[in-house]
């Protein structure tokens, strides 16, 4: 009799949901206080003037104004500031 051995099971075949990280408001954009600027893991971007940081390192606007990206310091870190209007 012709028989076929049963195929083995696999541990693959699933993926995690995307976390929708990244910059949400770009340089030159007008924002309101409370708007989320960046969702990130760790501090790829640092909080500058009028910008707050959440417990998951999310950066948000503390004041209404215009978004400005800048690199400063000896390590040329990226800072996001809000220039108040």
UniProtKB/Swiss-Prot annotation:
Entry GO terms, CC: cytosolic large ribosomal subunit
TM spans (from-to): none
PROSITE patterns the UniProt entry points to: RIBOSOMAL_L27
GO molecular function term, any single one: structural constituent of ribosome
Keyword match Coiled coil: no
UniProt keyword DNA damage present: no
Stretches for region Disordered: 1-22
Origin superkingdom: Bacteria
Keywords: Ribonucleoprotein, Ribosomal protein
GO BP terms: translation
Annotated family: Belongs to the bacterial ribosomal protein bL27 family.
Protein name: Large ribosomal subunit protein bL27
Species this chain originates from: Psychromonas ingrahamii (strain DSM 17664 / CCUG 51855 / 37)
Biological classification of the source: Bacteria, Pseudomonadati, Pseudomonadota, Gammaproteobacteria, Alteromonadales
